[in-house]
């Protein structure tokens, strides 16, 4: 029996060695047929002696039964996200913040790595054996994907070597190389199956299969980049040395990892990786920069759910070339006419793009764009596609000039362009069906009147059937009328009537926001409501009085005066006043509130992770803050969440105090 055990152990050791050479180092020493022979030999021995099968045997990677659902996993150490920077100026600002917090002037050493475009996972090893794998989820709770991760041959089921901690949680990214992605999609096309839009989606979809046997067939791989939980052992106090320790244990680590001293070396690494990006064989969307010293990392700490000692330096949006087939003109809520290019579909940054905004007539003129042109399309911020250039030497002879309409394409009203403004607008107001629809959608939206169940499709039908012309008409609807709409039964109709009834009780700030006055967002509406307290006072205010309100300048003041002075709007507001009520806003006297926010003009920027933006606004306002939507010299405080952008940069330029979300939460707690 001892010889059988020895033979099995030798086969397992040999197979693990060759798996590591093939899947991690990409340097196989034996042909596939020999690997298959060794695997088959092990399978036969284990079949004869099932009592000798162990969880970490190479034979146990594939074949677990399908799951009904993934169980939830609580991360013992939260899986934090990273803040982003998008240009060198923003990176230098990050570098300065790190130096300032450490009170250091000398160049710091950073560990620079690739920012892989895959799925973040956590691998928990106990006494060297992989016992659990989980997705990031929301950072606190993820999904148990152990059975699927065990099928990824790049991930060792047992760590090799010495000094392995009793419990260690390795973190990294599961991704799909481009060659495997293309092969997977080619096979799907042949079989008429689902084609994935990009390797990231393919990796995520493969990893979250309830049947591990499907995951096993997908060409997934893995690179590790950090550690979470660590118990019963020690790791080096340098991030890059930790990565080298992982590598010694048999874990895959990217070769493109480099120590850089000072910002110049970091930027040089970023530029080189950006240049080499196309030849890597897998998708990345930037580089990750981390302070290498663990001692310094601990000094720097964390902001809400991101470390202060690291940032993701993202690449610019990817670009592709395609052709403009047509240009159409859309009408927005305020009558803005927006030209939209209809494109020959093209994949940009992993998404099929067939439309792109052209913004306005000035942009069309600047580009020199014609219908039929070959253009460069960029996904701005990897979200909104836009045309950024024309390939003039590919212009066809029959390319047509783009004529901006003189009349609204929806209602036929005149289009006007106010001097000094780039945007042309339909003058039809609520006579225009397009504006009517968008105005009504805004009126019932969540942060306005919040009419539950009143979706876009319902609004469109109400306008098309001429049941509703303005917001006041919504409150004249009956269940009988609503049941005449598509997919609207008696119960749904009655629920909508109840929701409309509930919406009659609101706040003055929500009401003002719901009216859709140009450039009056939530923050401005709240400031107007707090300052004037009722409609009568607001109607009586002139431009100078309005300009005394935080967040209200000359332009916004004119919009408010013009809106309230327009006869049609007056009639709609009078009709709404008969059915909608709100308590007069409580007058907050800053001097009487013991709060660091009292009397301060505060701007929120970036993504908040602990409170929602709405909750943060409400709590700040309750403590006497005036929440503004833009940064100016009048701003007292900026609260910066994750991925804070231009507002944060402007605040730093103006020398305005900036705090993070964690500090805001602390101050809110002290004030309550």
Curated annotation (Swiss-Prot):
UniProt keywords, alphabetically? DNA damage, DNA repair, DNA replication, Ligase, Magnesium, Manganese, Metal-binding, NAD, Zinc
**Cofactors required:** Mg(2+); Mn(2+)
In this chain, NAD(+) is annotated as bound at: 32-36, 81-82, 113, 136, 173, 290, 314
**Purpose:** DNA ligase that catalyzes the formation of phosphodiester linkages between 5'-phosphoryl and 3'-hydroxyl groups in double-stranded DNA using NAD as a coenzyme and as the energy source for the reaction. It is essential for DNA replication and repair of damaged DNA.
Record-level GO BP terms? DNA repair; DNA replication
According to its UniProt record, the EC number is 6.5.1.2
Q: Which residues form the active site?
A: 115 (n6-amp-lysine intermediate)
Residues holding Zn(2+): 408, 411, 426, 432
Q: Which Pfam families does UniProt cross-reference here?
A: BRCT (PF00533), DNA_ligase_aden (PF01653), DNA_ligase_OB (PF03120), DNA_ligase_ZBD (PF03119), HHH_2 (PF12826), HHH_5 (PF14520), Nlig-Ia (PF22745)
Highest taxon in the source lineage:
Bacteria
Q: Main EC class of this protein? A: ligase
NCBIfam families tied to this protein: dnlj, PRK07956.1
As for family, the record states: Belongs to the NAD-dependent DNA ligase family. LigA subfamily.
**GO annotation, cellular component aspect:** cytosol
**What molecular function does GO assign, one term?**
DNA ligase (NAD+) activity
Give the protein's recorded name: DNA ligase
Substrates-to-products reaction catalysed = NAD(+) + (deoxyribonucleotide)n-3'-hydroxyl + 5'-phospho-(deoxyribonucleotide)m = (deoxyribonucleotide)n+m + AMP + beta-nicotinamide D-nucleotide
Q: Which residues form the BRCT domain?
A: 592-672
